[in-house]
């Protein structure tokens, strides 16, 4: 399960999506998230889903690689679906047994929550798969740069994001090594129910946390030895510039927004 996590990993390529300015991707991701949460009718979910599928095709990222990112949260998806079945009480009762009652509105909301989580994870994974952590950080820093006039720590926030994204694949690799070492000693992480499998993961957490703190300490010492003092006087090898592709992407997101709003109003 751990090796299936693709968040923070970069898939090398030279596709149209890879070449987009990271600021375009970040702003587009915000628009995409808003659109996904604006959808309140089942047929309208086809629009953001189709848009994500087109982006995956243009990015030339293997579909299996994107779908693999859903495996680690499959239990969360099932859990959220079941919880919403019993949390929503409005609507017409379709299933009633003892003290349990499930309404049509509860089923609809459960489906909506599940679809939103899937679409959001696919979109987020696609953004990290097609953007290097450094480019993503530079884009975020440039977007937040106007806030530095009111002493907002734009560079520090961007640096924290870079380190976090960079360490995700490292910690995944470290956890995989620890699991293999534990399995060589007879540990079993695959069999048993969900609670038993979660309990079996405890021996992995302690050495993983120790390794994470050790790596963080080594990184801090390396940054101090290189006289790192934040973003003051920092220059960049690659200066971010908007291109023709970014204009096309902005138009595509505008069309996506217009289609979604129109479908929401026209579809009963």
Please tell me what each predicted stretch does.
Residues 51-61, 76-79:
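Alpha-helical transmembrane segments and their membrane-interface exit regions
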Residues 69-77, 114, 118-121, 202, ...:
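Loop-to-transmembrane-helix entry motif
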Residues 14, 37, 61-65, 97, ...:
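Membrane-helix interfacial "entry" motifs
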Residues 41, 45, 60-64, 88-96, ...:
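Transmembrane helix-loop junctions in multipass membrane proteins, especially transporters and channels
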Residues 1-44, 48-57, 142-152, 156-159, ...:
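Transmembrane alpha-helix interface motif
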Residues 25, 64-74, 249:
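Alpha-helical transmembrane segments and their helix-start/interface "positive-inside/aromatic belt" motifs
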Residues 73-187, 194:
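Juxtamembrane/interface alpha-helical elements of multi-pass membrane proteins
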């Amino acid at each position: 399960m751990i090796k299936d996590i693709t968040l923070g990993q970069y898939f090398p390529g030279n596709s149209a999506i890879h070449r987009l300015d990271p600021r375009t991707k970040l702003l587009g991701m915000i628009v995409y998230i808003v659109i996904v949460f604006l959808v309140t009718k089942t047929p309208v979910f086809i629009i953001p889903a189709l848009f994500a599928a087109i982006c995956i095709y243009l990015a030339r990222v293997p579909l299996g690689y994107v779908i693999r990112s859903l495996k680690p949260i499959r239990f969360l998806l099932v859990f959220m679906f079941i919880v919403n079945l019993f949390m929503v009480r409005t609507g017409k009762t379709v299933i009633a047994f003892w003290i349990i009652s499930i309404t049509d509105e509860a089923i609809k909301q459960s489906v909506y929550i599940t679809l939103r989580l899937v679409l959001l994870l696919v979109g987020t994974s696609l953004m990290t798969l097609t953007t290097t952590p450094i480019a993503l950080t530079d884009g975020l820093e440039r977007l937040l740069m106007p806030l530095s006039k009111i002493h907002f720590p734009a560079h520090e926030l961007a640096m924290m994001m870079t380190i976090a994204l960079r360490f995700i694949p490292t910690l995944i690799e470290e956890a995989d090594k620890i699991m293999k070492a534990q399995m060589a000693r007879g540990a079993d992480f695959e069999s048993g129910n969900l609670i038993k499998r979660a309990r079996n993961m405890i021996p992995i957490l302690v050495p993983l946390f120790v390794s994470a703190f050790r790596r963080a300490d080594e990184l801090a010492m390396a940054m101090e030895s290189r006289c790192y003092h934040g973003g003051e006087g920092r220059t960049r090898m690659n200066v971010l510039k908007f291109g023709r592709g970014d204009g096309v992407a902005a138009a595509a997101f505008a069309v996506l927004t217009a289609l979604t709003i129109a479908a929401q109003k026209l579809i009963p």
